[in-house]
Amino acid sequence: MKKISILGSTGSIGVNALNVIRKIPEKFQVMHLTGNMNTEKMIAQGKEFLPASITMVDIQAAEIVEKALKGLSIEIYSGRDKLLDLAGDKNVDLLLNALVGASGMEPTLKALENGVDVALSNKESLVVAGDITVSYTHLTLPTKRIV
């Protein structure tokens, strides 16, 4: 079973990734989910996938999610710093970076620095910092079969 973190789980790519995981739950354990402000989707995802943690970049959104998921064994965090911490979690096999724009660059680098495989849907990580991003690939390559 592969442990996966999804940055941007409430966006279209994150939602589609969770749809795949839903079809093959024996293959993946969702460890971390992150979002910005979409509390409704995040609450539903938290209840269904029971990740170890959820991080909402927006502090007020995190408070809403925390209240809704009270009683479940899910750690709720807020802020970009926490998102960066979990991006580098060495206990995760795969990080799906579905963040929009340049905001996804730093988490990508953090994961690669720590030897975490990255599934990148965020082209800005390559456009803005392609040389830097590629320079870390020796820490995760050769590519491993995920499913």
Q: What are the language-model segments listed below?
A:
Residues 124-136:
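Rossmann-fold NAD(P)-binding glycine/threonine-rich loop
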Residues 57-58, 121-123:
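Short beta->alpha connector loops at strand-helix junctions that form conserved
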Residues 117-118:
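A short hydrophobic/small-residue beta-strand
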Residues 104-107:
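Alpha4-beta5-alpha5 switch/output surface of CheY-like receiver
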Residues 136-143:
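Conserved small/polar residues in nucleotide/adenosyl-binding loops
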Residues 45, 110-111, 135-136:
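Hydrophobic/aromatic ligand-binding patch that stacks against planar heteroaromatic rings
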Residues 1-102:
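N-terminal glycine-/serine-/threonine-rich beta1-alpha1-beta2 phosphate-ribose binding loop
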